[in-house]
Amino acid sequence: MSTKREVTPETTGMGRRRFINTAALAGLTAGVAACTDKPANAPATAASGPGAAPAAAQADAANATHLKPGELDTYYGLWSGGHNGDMRVLGLPSGREIHRIPCFVPDALVGWGITNESKKIMGTKPDGSLRYTVGDTHHTHASYKDGNYDGRYAWINDKINSRIARIRLDYFICDKITELPNVQGFHGIFPDKADPVDPAINYTTRVFCGAEFHIPLPNNGKDVDSPEKYRTMFTCVDAESMDVRWQVLIDGNCDLTATSYDGKLAATNQYNIEGGAHYEDMMSAERDACAFFNIARIEEAVKAGKFKTYGDSKVPVVDGTRESNKDAKTALVAYVSVPKNPHGVNASPDGKYFICAGKLSPTGTVIELSKVLDWFDGKSDKLDNAIVAEVELGLGPLHTAFDGRGNAYTTLFLDSQVVKWNVEAAIKFHAGDKNSKYVVDRADVHYQPGHINASQSETKAADGKYLAVGCKFSKDRFLPVGPLHPENEQLFDISGEKMVMLADHPVRGEPHDFIIFKRELVRPKQVYSHDDFPLAIKDAKESGVFRNGKKVTVKLTSQAPAFSLREFKLKKGDEVTLILTNLDKIEDLTHGIAIPKYNVQFVVNPLETASVNFVADKPGVYWIYCTNFCHALHLEMRTRMIVEG
């Protein structure tokens, strides 16, 4: 039996690219359709497809990602899960998925959204049911100290329901979720790296959030037919309390977010400065913006009471619209112009530049942060003087990563490529030196890349070792599994002058952004402490059934291979709280618990405590059993729940 997949015209390289490019270009403006494939100063496209690589190169690539049994990866990767609503933990360079962290949606494996503790974090309705059961995670970032990751926290957004989740990186669990007020389509997210005023605070204390969809404010059914009154918000969340500190009312729709290393500036690239509600209205202007936020001034305005609130929210909202921020010396927000409908804004590791990718323009725009601050200080009469380069990169530039050696790597969606370009050379070219060859290399990817990131790319410690590329289409790269294809995450070695493709990885849709950092930056704990849980049962002797009328508390412990109660009895109609503590202290000795017909299943890790509520409404015998293998007598690890009629 042949293992070769049949190739049809629809799945050949040229047919595929022609189809996707034609379809995409049909929806873009005439300006993009007229762009050339290669900038005038760009070298020829690198032939980096799998068929072009010699056997020796393929062998080297395979060796670079292959780990021997028991060998550990050198990097962690935190990946968004898309409309799975979770965060994924990968090891690199192997690309192996190690863990999934449930955040915004229920997870049957661990009981997220089933236990009382997880439901409290997720948020519930008055009847105790989950407020939301869907989520769409796009962007994940981690906390900083001294310009590098410090291993405390990571954050991830939910675009559907405008929520932000915090991940504790000691246990790799979600511990807090906040719903942002006055916001729809919460998209871009980035923590600050320092305080804008106090240099001693050289670590993350704020997380900034951009809203993509503009809405009437308050969104109460009025002004729905007046798009000119719609606005978006830029939100600041406290990194520790997870409370919303303040919001800024702005023009335009936010895409991504970036922060400066000195803490003075945050930014969001924007499309639809026109304020249109329909597709064609959002692309009529030739240039959109990258909005810069002066954090110190915003917080001074809030402190001085120069804000308003909307609807039921008590969050202070300052005015960051263009009309109210014309005077540089008092402005809270500055709008640097960039080509229409930009996609992505990324901070260079040297702290000097933010780079916006053009999307509908074939360009990358380099903005020098010191010149933005000059405008705020009244030292520059023209804000766009901060643009130090705007150069052609290719068709459909979306996101940018860095190697710490002065090079940027930008995904080209329509070209199905990554372009490597030198930032300082691009600045020289923009200044008039047409001999400055800023494009260093191009590599084909498979296919239609979106997000991109490199090892340590968004820190001062960018090391230029590995580059990951999130491709939105996999097409013929993997065994067919029906109509729904996996996405394709591709890994490159970027330690040399040329990008070298190392591996393809099929992933369940649809991941978006991700970060990659050295494994020594986090110190995960393998066993919980009883003190982490107020309801912890510290001794099996505390087990039992405790009744207060119809309200019943069942205290249960597990220690392989047995539960502390052989059976327990309830009465029909009892309102039950079952508390389970895992008394095992050994790493990797996780227990599960399931109650047939009662829709209960969750796990407890070593020394973890969790609880569930249910009504004992079905008389009979119900064998509670352990779902997570922990002992040779795993099948025998059970207890009887007897509900008397």
Predicted regions and their residues:
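N-terminal edge beta-strand
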Residues: 546-572
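Extracellular/periplasmic metallocenter environments
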Residues: 604-645
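Histidine- and aromatic-enriched segments that form or immediately flank copper-ligand environments
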Residues: 176-177, 579-609, 632-639
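A mature extracytoplasmic/lumenal domain signature
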Residues: 83, 94, 160, 169-171, ...
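Predominantly soluble domains enriched in secretory-pathway, periplasmic, or organellar proteins
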Residues: 39, 43-544, 613
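N-terminal secretory signal peptides
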Residues: 1-18, 22-32
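Beta-strand-rich interaction surfaces with strong enrichment in secreted/lumenal proteins
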Residues: 565-568, 599-603, 613
